[in-house]
Amino acid sequence: MPEFVVDGKAITRDGPAYVIAEIGHNHQGDVEKAKALIHAAQECGADAVKLQKRDNRRLYTRALYDSPYDNEHSFGATYGEHREALELSAAEWLELREFSREEGITLFGTVFDEESADFLAELGLPAFKIASADLVNTPLLRHVAGLGKPVFISTGGGTLEDVELAVETVLTVNSQLCLLQCTASYPCEVDELNLKVIETYRERFPDLVIGLSDHQSGIAMALVGYMLGARVLEKHFTLNHAWKGSDHAFSLMPEGLRRLVRDLRRVPDALGDGVKRPLPSEERPLEKMGKKLVAARDLPAGHVLGPGDIVARSPVDGGLPPYELDGLLGRRLGHPLVSDQDITFEDVEPVEELAARGVEQA
């Protein structure tokens, strides 16, 4: 069975969910906030946390870097200043690597350029993520794949042909690839999720683990994604929806992430084995609420039972089940019964006597 191994943990096409808490830049460039987010994600049961790394001077044109950036989420007067304010230093990345190891949660990053990929590789992080914006950036894909670490690729905004090109580019040099269905809007509306693409990917790429990078607020659609075959589930994560930054509003808070992890872990148990059978936990409720056949009223000995003489009432309590009704109709009582008394086959004439009277049962 194909598997995708991250930091010693094997992720398979039909195994348990691997949950990534996407911190991105929700730390606002503050290493202490980053630590708080990492700690909270670990407490919620996430398998990994993910940050983002950019070399902004190399990544953007001078015009974009120097362009005014004045809005409620801005951390600088220009777009370049804004992006630089959100970056962590090399020393802070090292600090977070050590902190994550102490916390017992995997840390890796989305890289937007080759220099950032090389930096995280030198830091010894165990995997890379490629964002949807770089789905067709084959030079970056080739470079990151060549670093020999597992690669996640988000596929928002792409066609199947784009995805096939990305897969071919990576697999040429690196077999450790996971595709994530994604819609590259923030937040994503429910009718834009196109979760059935997960099934398309599983059919088209049978040797790859498939996942979902979910930008929709809430947890229900991630659970649907799991049921469709996504085994990596990525959700944005914050500690405060009101914090400055465009991603906080649709990110999960700790309680939401905790519930998502809990529910994903429960799904395999809830699915069961497909064999329909009574369960021990059902015995008492069904004994109380189930039905047995009893006398509808006081009935004398010798009375020939008709439809109005027998009713189904609770509790079961060892009586005959309702499906035995037809086997009692038309037969004489061997002794009187009081209202609500159980009726059994021992209470009526034998079948042989019934036949001798020329009565046919249903």
Where are these regions (language model features)?
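Catalytic cores and adjacent flexible loops of soluble metabolic enzymes
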Residues: 1-362
